[in-house]
Regions:
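Active-site mouth loops of central-metabolism enzymes
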Residues: 39-50, 105-120, 141-142, 146-147
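N-terminal binding-site loop/beta-alpha segment at the start of enzyme catalytic domains
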Residues: 2-96, 133, 161
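Short, acidic/polar
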Residues: 47-59, 113-130, 178-183
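Beta/alpha (TIM)-barrel catalytic core signal, keyed to glycine-rich beta->alpha loops juxtaposed to Asp/Glu
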Residues: 11-12, 143-237
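Generic structural signal for well-ordered alpha-helices
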Residues: 22, 56, 79, 83-86, ...
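Active-site gating/metal-coordination segments in enzymes
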Residues: 108-139, 191, 199-203
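Conserved, mostly hydrophobic/aromatic
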Residues: 25, 37, 52, 67, ...
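Structural motif corresponding to the early beta-alpha repeats
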Residues: 89-114
Length: 237
């Protein structure tokens, strides 16, 4: 879910795309719905294919255009399930945004982290699981202290040049790490991250509101928030 999201108003149970607001993702030209559809925990573990498809279809009909996923969700099973659903629903590819994240791909050394090899392997695997030709958004799921940031920036730019991803970003990176990524990109004429995906809710505010303050101002990156309801705690769960 994007920060500052407002509720979608439903009128007479009909499709009401006009009630959904869309925001540019940072300084990019991509417009993302204020509400997004996530698949962490729920897909495979809690929802079967029929239930998941009903949820995705309902969200899409109400104007949600961003569907978020990751290689780590259900050990890739979440992307497999979403890919099956996308194929069945037959939405036009230019009407929705789909993402994946790279870091936790498996237990072996070459299946984890942000090395050039794993980034390329993870992207290709996500494309296959999701049954799409390209990813709109591709996130570094966490920072990797064992891989030079310049290697990660180069790997993401390779994928951009190949047309396998449209934008790349970070998730739960420190302001220092994001700044370094931009410094590397500027030095070697590469593209820096377009977005960051931090946790942000009333119980978790420090990083988003304070640590990232200068990052937002300096680099104008966008955000796609995870756990805006604190894993259900704020709903009274």
């Amino acid at each position: 879910m994007k920060s500052g999201a407002s509720p979608v108003i439903l009128l007479n149970g009909k499709n009401n795309h006009s009630n959904m607001n869309y925001r540019r993702l940072g300084n990019s030209g991509l417009k993302v719905s204020e509400l997004s559809f996530g698949s962490w925990v729920t897909f495979v573990n809690q929802l079967d294919e029929k239930s998941a498809m009903n949820c995705m279809s309902y969200a899409y009909d109400k104007g949600v255009n961003f569907f978020d996923n990751a290689e780590a969700y259900a050990s890739g099973g979440s992307e497999v399930l979403m890919g099956k659903i996308l194929k069945k629903l037959k939405w036009k590819r230019d009407t929705y945004i789909v993402s994946s994240k790279v870091f936790w791909g498996g237990e072996l050394p070459t299946q984890r982290g942000l090395s050039k090899k794993h980034i390329h392997d993870a992207c290709n695997a996500a494309l296959k699981r999701l049954k799409v030709d390209y990813l709109d958004l591709f996130f570094c799921h966490r920072p990797d202290p064992e891989t030079p940031i310049i290697e990660t920036v180069y790997a993401m730019n390779d994928l951009l040049q190949q047309g396998k991803i449209m934008y790349w970003g970070t998730s739960e990176w420190s302001a220092k790490e994001i700044n370094e990524a931009f410094s590397c990109a500027q030095k070697y004429n590469l593209r820096g991250p377009s977005m960051e995906q931090p946790q942000y809710n009333i119980l978790c505010r420090e990083r988003f509101e304070n640590e990232y303050k200068n990052i937002f101002k300096k680099h104008q990156i966008g955000t796609t928030i995870w756990s805006p309801l604190a894993s259900g705690i704020l709903t009274g769960k």
